[in-house]
UniProtKB/Swiss-Prot annotation:
The keyword Magnesium applies. This is Biotin carboxylase. Mn(2+) 1 binds at residues 276, 288. GO terms for biological process: fatty acid biosynthetic process; malonyl-CoA biosynthetic process. Mg(2+) 1 binds at residues 276, 288. Acetyl-CoA carboxylase is a heterohexamer of biotin carboxyl carrier protein, biotin carboxylase and the two subunits of carboxyl transferase in a 2:2 complex. It comes from the Bacteria.
Length: 449
C-alpha cells in the first residue's frame, strides 16, 4: 500500500481523499494556498504545506511547488482530485519522472483521451458507439468540409479537439454558416487551448447526458459500476446527478457497459474513469472520457457499495482489482445535489463567512462538504461547497429523502443554490425521470435552442 499521499487539491474532494487514505492507513500531506488556511482537512492531515498565494495559477496549478512539497514531506504518491491539474498529462508525467506515484492513469492515456479526436478514434477501435462526424480533424479545405457536413446532416456541432466542459464548441444549423463557424472555433481553440484543431459531429437536438463509471487496474482487469444520469445542467455544468440513469434501454445499456470495460483494457487504463455519452432515441453516443475521479462519484458508490477513492489508491499502489464484475450489484437509487455558494437567482458567486452550518441527517443521507460554522468561503475558486447525497430502495424514496435533506440543510451567512434544488426535486418532469440536457436552461428561461 502507498505510504504517504500528497493531496493536490482543496475543498470537499481533498477531505474525501483524506478520509479514504486514513481508512487505508496511509499518511497524508495537505497542500494549500494562503487563502485556504482554514480548510477543514488541513488540521486532519499528518502534514500541511502552503504552496503559494490565493490565485490558483500561483498555487494549485503550480507543478514545481506541488512536487517540492512532496519532496520535503517524503510523500510517495500524489492524488490530483478533480479540476486543477487532474487531467494534465504533463503533471502526471513530471510526478512519475520525479519518482512519485500519480494516483490516476499514465500520462500517455491522459493525452490520448484529452484530445477529443484521438479519444474518438480509440473508442471507435474498441467498438464504443460514437457520434457520426468527421473522421478525425475537420479539413481546412472548404469543399471537403462542406461535403462532410452534408453527409452527416445538419445541424452539426464544431468542437475544439482540446476543449471540454462546454467550451470551444459551436452549433451550425445550415451550410451558409459552416466555414465561418469553423474558422472562428479554430481561432478560439488556438487561443484557449493551444490547439487549433477542430472536428465536426452531428448535433443531437434533445439528448440526455448519461455516463459510465469504470475502474481499471492497468493490468488487464476492468469493471464498470453502472451508469449515472447528469442531464440537469446549466451552462454545461452539472447541477443534479443520479444513479442508475432512469428509463434506459437495458440491452443498449449492457452493450455499452461491455464496450467501456473492453476499451479500458485496450488503452491500458489505470484508476477510476468515466465515459460520457449523449443518449437519444435509445442509442448511446460517446463524447469524452474523464480520466479522474468525478464530483458525482458518490451516487455510484451508494448504489454499488464500492468506495471509488479507496479503489483508486489500491490500484495506484500496484494492486490488482479486488472486485470482479459479478460482485458488482446495482441496488436502489441515489441522487446528488451540488450545493454552490452562489446567488440562486443570478448565479453570481457568494463568498463570505459561514455563520452557521448544519448538515442534514437520517437514513440514506450523506453529505460531502468541507463547510463548518465559522469557515470563510474564499472568492478565488469554484463555488462548489458541498454535495447532498441520498439513497433509497427506489428513485421515489431517494427523492423523498432528498426533499427532507434539503429542508434540513442550513448554510447561514452566504447565499447558496439550495432553493433551486428544493424546486427541482419537486419538479414534475424531473420527478418523472428522463429529462434532457436542455431542460433546466429552458426552465430557467435561458434556452438558446
Amino acid at each position: 500500500m502507498l505510504e504517504k499521499v500528497l493531496i493536490a487539491n482543496r475543498g470537499e474532494i481533498a477531505l474525501r481523499i483524506l478520509r479514504a487514505c486514513k481508512e487505508l492507513g496511509i499518511k497524508t500531506v495537505a497542500v494549500h494556498s494562503t487563502a485556504d488556511r482554514e480548510l477543514m482537512h488541513l488540521s486532519l492531515a499528518d502534514e500541511s504545506v502552503c504552496i503559494g498565494p490565493a490565485p490558483a495559477t500561483q498555487s494549485y496549478l503550480q507543478i514545481p511547488a506541488i512536487i517540492a512539497a512532496a519532496e520535503v514531506t517524503g510523500a510517495t504518491a500524489i492524488h490530483p482530485g478533480y479540476g486543477f491539474l487532474a487531467e494534465n498529462a504533463d503533471f502526471a508525467e513530471q510526478i512519475e519522472r520525479s519518482g512519485f506515484t500519480f494516483v490516476g492513469p499514465t500520462a500517455e492515456v491522459i493525452r490520448l483521451m484529452g484530445d477529443k479526436v484521438s479519444a474518438k478514434d480509440a473508442m471507435k477501435r474498441a467498438g464504443v458507439p460514437t457520434v457520426p462526424g468527421s473522421d478525425g480533424p475537420l479539413p481546412e479545405d472548404e469543399e471537403t468540409a462542406l461535403a462532410i457536413a452534408r453527409e452527416v446532416g445538419y445541424p452539426v456541432i464544431i468542437k475544439a479537439a482540446g476543449g471540454g466542459g462546454g467550451r470551444g464548441m459551436r452549433v451550425v444549423y445550415d451550410e451558409s454558416e459552416l466555414i465561418k463557424s469553423a474558422k472562428l472555433t479554430r481561432t478560439e481553440a488556438g487561443a484557449a487551448f493551444g490547439n487549433p484543431m477542430v472536428y465536426l459531429e452531428k448535433f443531437l437536438t434533445n439528448p440526455r447526458h448519461v455516463e459510465v463509471q469504470v475502474l481499471s487496474d492497468g493490468q488487464g482487469n476492468a469493471i464498470h459500476l453502472g451508469d449515472r444520469d447528469c442531464s440537469l445542467q446549466r451552462r454545461h455544468q452539472k447541477v443534479i446527478e443520479e444513479a442508475p440513469a432512469p428509463g434506459i434501454d437495458e440491452k443498449a445499456r449492457q452493450e455499452v457497459f461491455a464496450r467501456c470495460v473492453q476499451a479500458c483494457i485496450e488503452i491500458g487504463y489505470r484508476g477510476a474513469g468515466t465515459f460520457e455519452f449523449l443518449y437519444e432515441n435509445g442509442r448511446f453516443y460517446f463524447i469524452e472520457m474523464n480520466t479522474r475521479v468525478q464530483v458525482e462519484h458518490p451516487v455510484s458508490e451508494m448504489v454499488t457499495g464500492v468506495d471509488i477513492v479507496k479503489e483508486m489508491l489500491r490500484i495506484a499502489s500496484g494492486e490488482k482489482l479486488s472486485i470482479r464484475q459479478e460482485d458488482v450489484v446495482i441496488r436502489g437509487h441515489a441522487l446528488e445535489c451540488r450545493i454552490n455558494a452562489e446567488d440562486p437567482k443570478t448565479f453570481m458567486p457568494s463568498p463570505g463567512k459561514v455563520k452557521h452550518f448544519h448538515a442534514p441527517g437520517g437514513n440514506g443521507v450523506r453529505v460531502d462538504s468541507h463547510l463548518y460554522s465559522g469557515y470563510s468561503v474564499p472568492p478565488n475558486y469554484d463555488s462548489l461547497v458541498g454535495k447532498v447525497i441520498t439513497y433509497g430502495a427506489d428513485r421515489d424514496e431517494a427523492l423523498a429523502r432528498m426533499r427532507n435533506a434539503l429542508d434540513e440543510l442550513i448554510v447561514d451567512g452566504i447565499k447558496t443554490n439550495t432553493e433551486l434544488h428544493k424546486d427541482l426535486v419537486r419538479d414534475a418532469a424531473f420527478c418523472k425521470g428522463g429529462v434532457n440536457i436542455h431542460y433546466l436552461e429552458k426552465k430557467l428561461g435561458m434556452d438558446k435552442h
